[in-house]
């Protein structure tokens, strides 16, 4: 009937900020942020892995340092053999090997730091990688950086876990790219921007990566942003997650502050047309 019930077991770990299920559905990985925002500021941030048992309970498998304290998000590359982690407060990203048979996490194989800033002196004084994910069809990986208004593009060596930069995609100043989703059947990606309330539609070239083809404002045109409490009353937008329906027919953008979800119809070329708001 869709109701939820606890399994009865509670696993305690310091400040788990992100949960990601492996594509084989056998393991769950958590990243742990150690910062003043979580109240646990000492030590080194890490990732932990758990085996998902038949009754839904979790059995801890391993922990591994990510090389930084500010872990924000994590995903798996298309092979399922590498964990891609953002280090929001350290301005970088990390790649860690993952064994899909045992659930064990290896030591960091790549950990580049980003450079630069954006026009917002509070939110963009330094780089802030927020999303890091792999292309579903190639070995390209992308890091959305809220602090620099760029999507950093890399080629992942799926033998060694090394990263080779292949360029950056610059978005509008002050946009604050937060995350990205891939269309399930089109070679199109959607970058949701937190600071200016937009989604950027990008075509994907298998070698060159992203090319922006459309930008849509997701808040009502007459909405005056009142600002999130952490924005010090400066009146920004505070866009949150963006996602696609399972069939790729619709794109959804969460409009924080306005407390709504913007719904867009996805066209045959991947471009968006506003449909409704809920």
Residue positions per predicted region:
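Residue-level detector of Asp-centered blade-edge/turn motifs that repeat once per structural unit
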Residues: 23-25, 78-80, 135-138, 184-186, ...
